Regions:
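Multi-pass alpha-helical membrane architecture of UbiA-family
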Residues: 1-162
Length: 162
């Protein structure tokens, strides 16, 4: 619906998809903490990254019917915007990890921080293979974000037991 009135519908998607970070933190701790808010914003940055890639698949077709998206807004500058979203994602998720794991051991903190770091490498791989005119490639990159999300979860799970 947002793509009918804004060039940034991916922000609305991010707001909806990532609210679980706020909910889970509050359910677990009994209060909303700043690491959850930072994780939420980092999740929105990640949504902007992967859904801009996805939106490039049909950017030419949706232009014909007047639908808006970040892919159309950024156009030939999409790679630079994706780079910014990648950096914001990794930095914000890393900051959230620091806030959430500050009372854990140094080893647990280092392992947990490996999650956003490794996720960043995966997003960089996507960026390196990004071609706005290659629809099958765009689908492959978009779908690889399932793995991008699992990477930090695996690191966090290991850190939890340290």
């Amino acid at each position: 619906f947002a793509k009918r009135f804004t060039w940034w519908p991916q922000v609305f998607l991010g707001l909806a998809f990532n609210w679980g970070a706020l909910l889970a933190w509050t359910a677990h701790t009994g209060a909303l903490g700043w690491p959850a808010v930072v994780l939420y914003v980092g999740g929105i940055a990640w949504t902007l990254f992967y859904d801009t890639i996805y939106a490039h698949q049909d950017a030419d077709e949706i232009a014909l019917i007047g639908v808006k998206s970040t892919a159309r807004l950024f156009g030939d500058d999409s790679r630079n915007w994706l780079r910014r979203f990648l950096a914001a994602t990794v930095l914000l998720i890393g900051l959230a990890v620091i806030g959430a794991a500050i009372d854990r051991s140094v080893l647990a903190m280092v392992v947990a921080l490996g999650g956003p770091w490794a996720m960043g490498w995966h997003l960089a791989w996507q960026l390196r293979h990004f071609d706005a005119k290659d629809s099958p490639g765009l689908v492959r990159l978009f779908r690889s974000n399932r793995d991008a999300g699992l990477i930090p979860v695996l690191f966090f799970a290991v850190a939890w037991f340290l």
